């Protein structure tokens, strides 16, 4: 039996919101979804009028919906923002090259400028080349570190004031679970914070922090947005996948599990008055780092020297050798060359 929209009570409902359980028509769902993101932006004071804001665009559903909604809200509420798309080309054949075509279409559809930076131009390596050397066990570590820095560098080239990423509520809950399981409580503040400033060269924010992944998919579907839906070919063994599967099981039993986990992470995070490692700059590339060498430079050094394990795990004692170009001992080289494919 058809159900009327619980909001307007006039049109026929086409969906039941996973987040609230309300039955809504398309127009009322669009309005509710957009207004919740507007409320998130305003209550957290994410932007200031006149700012140049870079949107991390991958062509996937999250970044596509983020770009669309930010453009809509920027015009509806006169935020006064200068929006620009920033994409990273990791160099993954059959995946990133296809998704970048989607980003280029989004650029035309939303009439926003686009900047693409690549691993090849920044680091001299593509992810295809990296995987051949390091295998599929630790490749996500390399990609995550390089992509984060590449997005910052692309944004710096454009002179943006802030970077927006498409991290949604599910992503944040997954990260909280991963940090719990690894016993890494110190990272809870960063992963649950809607804005992070000290961890990168440019402040980052997550306007979709409280948006459920299912609702993002529904929004993209009913809006007929153009997005790329293929998973990365190198990520099937990623640790995040286990946290994601566990979260889906929890959500099936208790739909509020996603928000419950996020709030738990916020309550358990390290407080502002607790002393954290002092952020300095990498002596090699100048990027923000709490060590003499940033993680990207250590990983890159390992790749260039044929020592793929150099940046995996804790090898801070070797940093002085890297900086002074001292040769490693045979035992150190043997340990750092061994890779589990």
Swiss-Prot record:
Listed EC numbers: 2.7.7.-
Protein origin, superkingdom: Eukaryota
Gene Ontology biological process terms in this record: protein urmylation; tRNA thio-modification; tRNA wobble uridine modification
Keywords of the record: Cytoplasm, RNA-binding, Transferase, tRNA processing, tRNA-binding
Predominant location category: cytoplasm
MF annotations from Gene Ontology: nucleotidyltransferase activity; tRNA binding
Database matches in InterPro entries: CTU1-like_ATP-bd (IPR056369), CTU1_C (IPR032442), Ncs6/Tuc1/Ctu1 (IPR000541), Rossmann-like_a/b/a_fold (IPR014729), TilS/TtcA_N (IPR011063), tRNA_thiolation_TtcA_Ctu1 (IPR035107), UPF0021_CS (IPR020554)
Pathway where it operates: tRNA modification; 5-methoxycarbonylmethyl-2-thiouridine-tRNA biosynthesis
Homology family: Belongs to the TtcA family. CTU1/NCS6/ATPBD3 subfamily.
The keyword Oxidoreductase appears for this protein: no
GO cellular component: a single term: cytosol
Function: Plays a central role in 2-thiolation of mcm(5)S(2)U at tRNA wobble positions of tRNA(Lys), tRNA(Glu) and tRNA(Gln). Directly binds tRNAs and probably acts by catalyzing adenylation of tRNAs, an intermediate required for 2-thiolation. It is unclear whether it acts as a sulfurtransferase that transfers sulfur from thiocarboxylated urm1 onto the uridine of tRNAs at wobble position.
Keyword RNA-binding: yes
One Pfam match: ATP_bind_3
Protein name: Cytoplasmic tRNA 2-thiolation protein 1
């Amino acid at each position: 039996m058809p159900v009327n929209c619980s909001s307007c009570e006039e049109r026929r409902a086409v969906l039941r919101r996973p987040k609230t359980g309300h039955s809504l028509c398309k127009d009322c769902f669009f309005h509710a979804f957009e207004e919740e993101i507007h409320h998130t932006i305003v209550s957290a004071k994410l932007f200031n009028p006149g700012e140049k804001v870079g949107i991390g665009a991958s062509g996937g559903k999250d970044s596509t919906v983020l770009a669309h909604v930010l453009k809509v809200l920027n015009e509806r509420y006169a935020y006064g923002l200068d929006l620009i798309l920033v994409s990273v080309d990791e160099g993954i054949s059959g995946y990133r090259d296809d998704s970048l075509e989607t980003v280029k279409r989004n650029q035309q559809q939303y009439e926003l400028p686009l900047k693409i930076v690549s691993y090849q131009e920044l680091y001299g390596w593509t992810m295809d080349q990296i995987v051949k050397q390091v295998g599929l066990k630790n490749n996500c570590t390399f990609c995550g570190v390089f992509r984060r820095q590449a997005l910052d560098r692309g944004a710096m080239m454009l002179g943006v004031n802030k970077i927006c990423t498409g991290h949604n509520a599910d992503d944040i809950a997954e990260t909280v679970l991963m940090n719990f399981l690894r016993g890494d409580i110190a990272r809870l503040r960063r992963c649950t914070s809607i804005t992070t400033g000290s961890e990168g060269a440019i402040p980052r924010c997550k306007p979709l922090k409280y948006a459920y992944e299912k609702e993002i998919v529904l929004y993209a579907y009913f809006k007929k947005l153009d997005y790329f839906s293929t998973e990365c070919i190198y990520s099937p063994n990623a640790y995040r996948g286990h946290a994601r599967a566990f979260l889906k099981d929890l959500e099936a039993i208790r739909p509020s599990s996603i928000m419950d986990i996020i709030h738990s992470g916020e309550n358990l995070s390290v407080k502002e008055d607790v002393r954290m490692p002092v952020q300095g700059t990498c002596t090699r590339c100048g990027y923000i780092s709490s060590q003499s060498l940033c993680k990207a430079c250590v990983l890159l050094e390992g790749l260039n020297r044929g020592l793929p394990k150099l940046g995996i795990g804790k090898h801070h004692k070797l940093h002085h050798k890297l900086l002074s170009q001292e040769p490693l001992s045979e035992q150190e080289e043997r340990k750092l060359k061994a890779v589990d494919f």
